[in-house]
Amino acid sequence: MRKTAEGAHLGTPRRIAGLRVVMSWPDSEFTPAPARPGAFRARLAAVAGAVLLAGGAITIAVALLAQQHAPQPSAAAAGATGPAAKGPSLHRSLPVSVDIPAIGVHSQLLHLGVTADGSIQVPSLTRSADEAAWFKYSATPGQIGASVIEGHVDSYQGPAVFFRLGALRPGDTIDVTLADGVTAIFRVTGVRQYLKEKFPAKTIYSAADYAALRLITCGGTFDYATGHYLSSTVVFASLTSSRGPGGPEKSS
């Protein structure tokens, strides 16, 4: 396992459609960085310990810790990784923003690619913890193929853009606004969690025969000994309809 300069935790290199893909996840041991995944809870844990030593109200600190656990996907939310039937698709247009009403997310979208060593870039924790990023070597949202958007779950400042991603359920909607003014409307088909050493990169990043969307963040248990999450949460969604600028919703 390796780390990027941004503190990304890297897995086994893979090649997908000629692209060398090294799965990366935000890590908590890079320097210098005032923000990192899970570190907010780690800092609260330190505060809790200090309160305990002082004989103070430890229950308050424990309550704060409990409140900062990101929602995890339930077995009922696993659903499917794709739709039952092929749906509509859109022409290529770069994504501008993403909205997820069920979990209160609105974010402008960064466009990120790969680093010099071929690993997938992640948003900067120091500057962009509250912004999601579209992987620019994936399909644009609404195109036939898999479009990938990633975001951090938390940082030193607390919950980040995809903190509540694991709370999504099949049927929830995801709206991606495109540069041409069209909004691509996706419906969640499933939410799954994978141990990072078993992350199915081919399933997530390889081409699909329908307009697919994948949202990715860290999830599962936070390992305080190593300073990173043990799993990744992945939301699978498919395009169901779209709206034009000022126009009605359409399904094709």
Regions found by a protein language model. Name each.
Residues T59-L168, L178-V182, G190-S252:
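Solvent-exposed, non-transmembrane regions of membrane-associated and secreted proteins
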